[in-house]
């Protein structure tokens, strides 16, 4: 896979281009008198070291860019790498099937679970079909239908959060966007099964929170979680989206800061260069965390689980 490099990664991109060029020359002419292998290896080591240096000092705005990276793994990618026997379920049984939300029954190391997550899409047609990962009310009602099914059959619920926010269109508002989100918040707080939520990319406002009320809330290292996008915040406070980097720093949208505030439980480390650089490794780390969380929650009685979730919600805002 050819990598897309962000602006702050351009020094890495230049090194990778040199590596690709030398590798291509070496393959095209095996009769070259000079050995390029040592030079290629030297450049690769230099690229790794440079990547470590750049990623060791990322700001909140750079993390926000990584959270939106077009090659970042989405919900369906993690389903493919982590779960088996996935059977997708569709529709809210009231209006339509919103493709911005995917969900269904699968097995996690043999254990039946219900998976629900946002899905953005890769190519233009798929992005449009999935509305860029911005669900309408029917998407959240589909999610709730699947959660209630999981509750009836005593299956743990695993959600993957990755959305700029709930869709703000006129049609969505007419069909009750705010009601759908609010109902999910209420109902998720009373479900009798373990709920594990993970922010895998963008965690945008109520659109993220609508499938984010859980017993465990995790974030990938280079994901974000906020009430508004940095650009939106900058447009309100400074009347200019150009101030987005400043807004990102002020808002505290990155995983380590949110863990300090006790809004999330775990920051899951990503491979060097972010999740899209090594999806299998990222999926393995995420799977290990999900299994650990399930093990922690499965031993709780229904009453203890609900009391713990209630206390978690009541403690928000207290550091």
From Swiss-Prot:
Residues 35-296 form the CoA carboxyltransferase C-terminal domain. GO terms for biological process: fatty acid biosynthetic process; malonyl-CoA biosynthetic process. SUPFAM superfamilies: ClpP/crotonase. Belongs to the AccA family. Keywords: ATP-binding, Cytoplasm, Fatty acid biosynthesis, Fatty acid metabolism, Lipid biosynthesis, Lipid metabolism, Nucleotide-binding, Transferase. Its EC number is 2.1.3.15. The keyword ATP-binding applies. The lineage of its organism: Bacteria, Pseudomonadati, Pseudomonadota, Gammaproteobacteria, Enterobacterales. Pfam families: ACCA. GO terms for cellular component: acetyl-CoA carboxylase complex. This is Acetyl-coenzyme A carboxylase carboxyl transferase subunit alpha. Pathway: Lipid metabolism; malonyl-CoA biosynthesis; malonyl-CoA from acetyl-CoA: step 1/1. One of its GO terms (molecular function) is carboxyl- or carbamoyltransferase activity. InterPro entries: Acetyl_CoA_COase_a_su, ClpP/crotonase-like_dom_sf, COA_CT_C. It is found in: Cytoplasm.
